[in-house]
Amino acid sequence: MITTLVCSAVAMSALFTPISFAFSQDAVKPAATPAATNPIKIVSSLPRTGSANAQTTSMVNGIKMAISEVGGKIGAQEIIYEDWDDASAQRGNWDPAIEAANADKAINDASVLAYIGTFNSGAAKISMPLLNKVDLVMVSPANTAPALTKAGFGEANEPEVYRPSGKVSYFRVVPTDDVQGAVGADFAKEIGGTKVFVLNDREVYGKGVAGVFETHAKKIGLEVVGVEGVDTKASNYKSIVTKMKQAGADVVFFGGTTQTNAAQIAKDIVSGGLKAKFIVPDGCYEQAFIEAAGNRALEGHAYITFGGREPKALETKEGKAFYEHYKSMYGGEPEGYAVYGYEAAKVVLSAMDRLSKAGTELTRENVRAEIAKTKDFVGALGTWSFDANGDTTNRTMSVNTVKNGKFETVKVVD
């Protein structure tokens, strides 16, 4: 599903026209940085098919809202926004072939000056090097795997493999899992945990955050009684629950997402009689997780870490304004990641605006370089900067539980 948004200075509200086209699977050929055309285009690549849809719809709403707030223009140039799906019905989740095709499409459209995405860290590994070759900036509202930007967290060639041009062209507005995993382990100890069993979904994001949790748990004196990758398509996890009971686990951490069966694990822990708290990361911070697991499996049992505060608890003037504007514009509560979609778009628009006011041509390279200079950005998430790796300096995390079918914050860690 692809949605096109054209904003104008007169029309502050969005106009959405569905369009469709075939994605090329051909190899991407490096090209010279194209000059901006009029209009200019911003695209996003997020999983719009499957259970992540509600979360990503909220993120897309945030992007659209940010564009509407600048009147749909940068200087005299109109902004066109296109919402691209990187998921397939067959997988019910992001699809490597579609993400590659989206990157290909963006590269070969000279009007595209910014690529907002991806939602999944594994998807980012595909598009990052392709976009980097042509200076097309990528700003993620959701990727948290540290290895995408920092050495020592993944393969020996990471993150350099994602920067074939030698330049940093990938940025993210969300804290990374070297922060999140440690917060989860600290909280496990805080609630009285002594023996932890660490599960992961065998994907980039899940393995990464589980690995950080495991390392930090050992560092703070928790006993890791088991580590296991799970089959995310399994109908149940009764055998693993039995294994965890035998190991005496009083805390279970799952590095994974709603889409990789976190809800089924939660249900089987409770139905299997395992008296352990269940901790999951931000890949489960969405209403779809609560709906899939059910209140019985979560309330009093589960905790969910998240990179920031829940939308209604945003503390800054800009954060409060985002929350009220979102509710007014869309008639409902934003999901947790809506503000990150909004902030990603705002930082792109701010960079473009600075270039325009300076009389500098809006080209891919100029936009990339200007975003890299982002410092003391005053946004809905607070005041933050991008570091030399493209990571945000914002490190705020929250730990949340579930009550009456809704997320409720237990603590905030700044």
PLM regions and their residue ranges:
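Bacterial N-terminal signal peptides
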Residues: 5-18
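Extracytosolic ligand-binding ectodomains
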Residues: 15-18, 22-414
